[in-house]
């Protein structure tokens, strides 16, 4: 299938990515100096805090208002899939565990979970969109490029659209980041700055992506009249 072909191509790219990252970082540092590497910690904190707030505010709100269940019930039910996603950095690899948690812990039917969760693992990438937006701003600041309000809005739109087409495999978000940077006229070499910490960022965004899939499945189940577990 087309999806499997894309996964294999992505895997091939990621195998040689470290060599390309080293070369890009060498060029960037030689041109702009070591000071350009200093804000990495801020990027990591921004992505992790953003993901945490998204889960605690958006997902908790949806579960409470629509599914009529407590956030503690939800996060307790999906903690295994969240941990697996954090470790594997792959929505696709986590999918079997996500489906099992949805059925056994949340009480979502096979009919809904087997449709919503695989679809979500393909197109529902909240964490990836957040990550791409933060990284685009980081690249702009690192290169001293001012962004107008329109450019920032363009980043939000492009990051959202690019995340929908991101494969659920480790490192795929970094490849799609090039589209976001190109769309707003930022230097594509900025990907090298992000690549050095991408594995750390990938853990958080994949965890949020998978959690969002389970949240949507819970909401769909509730709106379809199913009785969720307590």
Please tell me what each predicted stretch does.
Residues 1-73:
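Signature of multi-pass transmembrane helix bundles
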Residues 16-19, 50, 120-131, 197-212:
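Membrane-embedded alpha-helical segments of transport systems
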Residues 3, 41-58, 77-83, 153-164, ...:
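Small-residue-enriched core segments of transmembrane alpha-helices in multipass membrane transport
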Residues 133-230:
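Transmembrane alpha-helical segments and their short flanking loops
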């Amino acid at each position: 299938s087309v999806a499997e072909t894309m996964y294999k191509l992505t895997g091939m790219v990621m195998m040689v990515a470290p060599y390309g990252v080293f070369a890009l970082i060498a060029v960037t540092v030689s041109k702009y100096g070591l000071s350009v590497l200093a804000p990495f910690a801020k990027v990591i904190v921004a992505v992790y805090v953003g993901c945490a707030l998204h889960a605690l505010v958006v997902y908790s709100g949806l579960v409470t208002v629509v599914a009529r269940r407590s956030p503690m019930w939800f996060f307790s039910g999906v903690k295994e899939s969240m941990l697996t996603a954090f470790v594997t950095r792959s929505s696709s690899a986590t999918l079997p565990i996500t489906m099992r948690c949805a059925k056994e812990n949340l009480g979502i039917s096979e009919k809904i979970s087997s449709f919503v969760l695989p679809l979500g693992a393909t197109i529902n990438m909240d964490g990836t969109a957040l990550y791409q937006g933060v990284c685009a701003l980081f690249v702009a600041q690192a290169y001293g490029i001012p962004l107008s309000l329109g450019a920032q809005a363009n980043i939000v739109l492009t990051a959202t659209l690019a995340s929908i087409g991101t494969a659920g495999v480790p490192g795929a978000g970094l490849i799609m980041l090039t589209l976001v940077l190109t769309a707003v006229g930022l230097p594509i070499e900025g990907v090298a700055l992000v690549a050095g910490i991408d594995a750390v960022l990938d853990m958080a965004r994949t965890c949020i992506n998978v959690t969002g899939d389970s949240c949507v499945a819970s909401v769909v189940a509730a709106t379809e009249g199913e009785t969720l577990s307590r």
